[in-house]
A protein has these predicted regions:
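Single-residue signature of alpha-solenoid repeat helices
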Residues: 52, 86-87, 119, 155, ...
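Canonical positions in the second alpha-helix
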Residues: 59, 92-94, 126, 158-162, ...
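Register position in tetratricopeptide repeats
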Residues: 45, 79-80, 112, 148, ...
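Start-of-helix register in tetratricopeptide repeats
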Residues: 34, 68, 101, 134-137, ...
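TPR/TPR-like (Sel1-like) alpha-helical repeat modules
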Residues: 95-100, 128-129, 164, 298, ...
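Structural marker of alpha-solenoid helical repeat scaffolds
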Residues: 62, 93-97, 129-131, 164-165, ...
Length: 471
């Protein structure tokens, strides 16, 4: 991938100007395959997908067999259109299949097709052809690919083949693996060391922010994001990390500001529009949320992994606007993708009915979900949350009591809601019991649900002591 500094260089901008001038005048001009691929990537990162494809396809037509434009088209088909067959069609046209970009793309096609063993065997065969000087780089690239597909064990196995374990690239992959395994403290220590050694490296600050966010140290995560933003105000990952942090703290207006900044830069897919829509729903601005979610739906490719979330959030917005039938239709669209939990989505239909004053219709959907799921705890939990959200505190209290008697030992959700039920029902001792449990087991949920009852800067771990000292 060409880096941003090259796209901002005088050399590239002059080439881009010449290309655009020739396009506007409709005259032929010579640009080599590498340049056309660079222009395509520049347009793509700027959200100008049609212009990007036009430039890349010019390269494909003018330079048959040239790697850069063909790999660009292959990656576009694989990662954005979710079409591995078309991606492979472009890849097969490359003359030199030994190019690293071709090797990596072929492996990714196999991974998308869920052929993990074939991909690993192929990559190990390619490793045998690597020069000693390039071996570590190849291994680290493969580990990175596996991390991108959440194949943590594969990434760790490949990382063990690296000889130079002191390099920053090795340490970065080691840190990412730690985060992927849930070892957030270890990951944070690795990225802290990396930012100490490379204080102006935004990617390390971003990874540090992620490790702190996953450890529920939201304020530290925001601070790390701010360092990254200070280095590069247009760093998409840093802006997104800060937005996520502010959202987690319930600072929705501030989160909206940073999601909007992210969205203005990240134009190649619908992600930013989704985040803005969700935030606007939390700000009780459903009409505005609907506009952004509909734009996200328009931007999404037919098989986008984001479609279920888009349909669900659109249904939320429509329900808030009292458009029950339209909301239910969107839930059906989410079910039709085959990628959502049908029982939980059926509960969501019940929530829409309950939110709009139709308790009998809601009950029918809830019972349908319970029967179909054979009383699965996650389904019962979602029904209890819906009942709670709609103000039926006595019923929610009973449902949470029933739920907590049947959940597995590692269950962490809903204790914050139960503590508030107890508070509203004047069950003081139970309120304190569930408050303590909520803050110990799920501090992020506690912050979201209980935060308004405590000082803004107080960490959830301190809620119980704060309350007991007030008595």
């Amino acid at each position: 991938m060409t880096n941003d500094s090259y796209f901002n260089s005088e050399e590239f901008l002059q080439t881009l100007h010449s290309y655009e001038e020739a396009e506007q005048e409709g005259r032929a001009a010579y640009f080599d395959s590498d340049t056309l691929a660079d222009i395509a990537e520049y347009y793509y990162t700027d959200g100008r997908t049609n212009d990007a494809l036009n430039a890349a396809l010019k390269g494909v037509d003018m330079f048959p067999g040239a790697m850069p434009p063909l790999v660009f088209m292959g990656r576009y088909e694989l990662l954005k259109q979710n079409n591995p067959q078309k991606a492979e069609w472009y890849l097969e046209q490359v003359d030199d299949q030994s190019e690293p970009e071709c090797v990596y793309l072929r492996a990714e096609i196999m991974l998308v097709e869920n052929k993990k063993d074939e991909a690993d065997e192929f990559l190990r065969q390619q490793l045998e052809w690597q020069d000693d000087a390039e071996r570590d780089n190849f291994v680290l690239d493969v580990a990175d690919i596996y991390l991108d597909y959440d194949l943590i064990d594969h990434a760790q196995e490949w990382l063990s083949m690296v000889e130079d374990t002191q390099s920053t690239d090795y340490q970065e992959v080691l840190g990412r693996i730690a985060l992927g395994k849930g070892e957030y403290q270890q990951g944070e220590e690795i990225f802290k060391k990396l930012v100490e050694d490379n204080p102006f490296a935004s990617p390390y600050w971003n990874q540090l922010a992620s490790s702190q966010f996953l450890s529920n140290r939201i304020k530290d995560s925001i601070e790390s994001s701010e360092y990254s933003i200070a280095i590069n105000p247009n760093d998409e990952e840093a802006l997104l990390n800060k937005a996520n942090g502010m959202f987690s703290l319930g600072e929705y207006e501030e989160a909206l500001t940073y999601y909007t900044r992210f969205n203005n830069l990240h134009k190649d897919d619908e992600t930013g529009e989704i985040f803005i829509g969700i935030t606007l729903i939390n700000l009780d601005r459903p009409a505005e949320a609907l506009q952004h979610l509909q734009k996200a739906e328009e931007m999404a490719v037919p098989r986008s992994i984001n479609l279920v979330e888009i349909y669900q959030e659109t249904a939320f917005a429509l329900s808030r606007l009292g458009r029950v039938d339209d909301a239910l239709a969107y839930v059906n669209k989410a079910i039709a993708t085959g990628n959502g939990n049908e029982d939980e989505l059926t509960v969501f239909k019940g929530h829409i009915q309950l939110e709009n004053g139709n308790p009998l219709a809601a009950q029918n959907y809830f019972l349908e979900a319970v029967r179909h799921s054979k009383s699965a705890p996650n389904v019962y939990f979602r029904i209890a949350i819906s009942v709670y959200d709609n103000g039926y505190m006595q019923l929610a209290y009973r449902m949470f009591h029933t739920l907590f008697q049947s959940v597995p030992a590692d269950w962490k959700d809903g204790y914050s809601h139960m503590s508030l039920c107890c508070k509203h029902l004047n069950k003081e001792s139970e309120f304190l019991y569930f408050l303590r449990k909520a803050c110990e087991l799920n501090p992020m949920e506690a912050k979201t649900i209980l935060g308004e009852y405590f000082p803004k800067d107080l960490d959830p771990e301190s809620y119980y002591n704060y309350i007991t000292k007030q008595k």
